[in-house]
């Protein structure tokens, strides 16, 4: 019997290896809302968390219990009370909160302990540690309303948490914390996860909600948001009356975490099997990232980028779309190239060849990775090349193209005669290739 080979599996593994190396030894804070815990996909999420641990990632898991607490209150016919969208935790509510949180802690610990069963890592031991790593204090009284046992973080024993992470344990923390006087307080999982990510200097904070991240007006996933954009989303949702959805709660924390030094905060769906792995081990992820600095950068190319440029343009050269360039030619002309990189992969490039005497520049070798051609990378490159041309005193920009005529025309270029090319370029014109000449004023 001949075994079938899966090239998709091979390609996926090759693409994931750089991320495995990057993530190893880093600290991730994972926030699991009560909605995620009660979903049928939760066992898969726990298995994926166990897999992350086996890859050497330091994990702090924070769980919430909102729906479980509400169900407990309803079962005991105890009406929940809120003030300014914050739960008021009276003595009776506190007992039910502790009951729900305690049950979840035992359940999650048990699931994590067996998460690697039925895998090649079966028998590997996962140590899950919980404790009084967080000291709480009361929220107090606001507008005459006593929040009772609703609290906030007073301090975090980050050194003790680091010791547990150094020993290879997963740290598991829930919504109940104690004060210096021995009282118990009900805290939000968002505050706990956010403050832990900040204090532990975590590389990432990861949250789960019902949808696959934040969407735009067309319903498409927004892959990246800066903190000010995420804050605007929160304010818009609050204006619409949404104060406590999983997305809004996470975004509030993500904005604060990013502004306090956490590099990336990820929002993904608890309903999608494997979403955690797809988000962390693929170039584009599957959800929404909140970042201070984009995973994508546009910059001038250096000699170290030649390999990436060649890998990008070779298929287009083989199809006859681009004129062939040797490695030696690229090495000599690398200072003319601008590239767009995403997670150290070159996904687009273009070059500017100036003709100073005629005050004209050529935009050449324009290439965009097939996975990104439906996005605006071409426009981004055009804007950058045009800006570079104006900066050095050029007044016009031209292109020679056989396939992208309409694309350039839609962006202000018009067909012109070959005679309008700079003299040196005119002498090099390939009449067999018969490229169209298009030109635009830079203004």
Curated annotation (Swiss-Prot):
Keyword Magnesium: no
N-acetyltransferase domain residues: 296-434
Enzyme nomenclature, EC number: 2.3.1.1
Enzyme category, top tier: transferase
Annotated Pfam families: AA_kinase, Acetyltransf_1
A GO cellular-component term linked to this record: cytoplasm
SUPFAM superfamilies listed in its UniProt record: Acyl-CoA N-acyltransferases (Nat), Carbamate kinase-like
InterPro entries given in the database record: AceGlu_kinase-like_sf, Acyl_CoA_acyltransferase, Asp/Glu/Uridylate_kinase, GNAT_dom, NAGS_kin, NH2A_AcTrfase
Primary residence: cytoplasm
GO biological process, one term: L-arginine biosynthetic process
Subunit structure: Homohexamer.
Family to which the UniProt record says this protein belongs: Belongs to the acetyltransferase family. ArgA subfamily.
HAMAP family according to UniProt: N_acetyl_glu_synth (MF_01105)
PANTHER family hit by this protein: AMINO-ACID ACETYLTRANSFERASE, AMINO-ACID ACETYLTRANSFERASE NAGS1, CHLOROPLASTIC-RELATED
Full protein name: Amino-acid acetyltransferase
Originating species: Escherichia fergusonii (strain ATCC 35469 / DSM 13698 / CCUG 18766 / IAM 14443 / JCM 21226 / LMG 7866 / NBRC 102419 / NCTC 12128 / CDC 0568-73)
Taxonomic path: Bacteria, Pseudomonadati, Pseudomonadota, Gammaproteobacteria, Enterobacterales
Encoding gene per record: argA
